Amino acid sequence: KVILPRYKCIPQKFQEKMEYRGSFYMDLCSDGKQYYVGIMEYQKDGVVYDFIDNDEFFSWGNPYTNLIDDIPKFCYFAKASLAALNYLDWTPDIVHCHDWQAALVPLYLRTCFQNTNVGRASAVLTIHNLRFQGIYDRKMIQYWSGLPDYVFNKDCMIGCQHVKGRYRLL
């Protein structure tokens, strides 16, 4: 199973073959704001691709536009991906996270999802391009991720380095 954002730049011929699997709302920010999570499925060559659908985050551009303020989009995607697995009642043995955009997944697994089926999964993080490291201000990460204060200490932010008041997610 592969989980991806449903960007509008995905060619129409693939969009037309996606099937609706369900939707729900989840809290995201530290203020508890609720966001829509839609799940669209596409299958090819025996592989199931689940696309996380939310026009607020994925309706414009492509994965490489607007890199400056991507933290809201990828906090949403990381948490929505795990919430979708719970919604679909599918528990992986290992969650493979790729690049900084998914680097919060292991933290979410051990905090927000620790008492769920998906919270039992292990996680591995791979890196494709070290140029993009997801460096953001702590307040911005904390607001959008909704992660508690204790996560932002050097012993808990596994893999996330503190650099001059900002955090590097890789």
Predicted features along the sequence, with ranges:
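Catalytic cores of nucleotide-sugar-dependent glycosyltransferases that transfer UDP/GDP/TDP-activated
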Residues: K1-L170
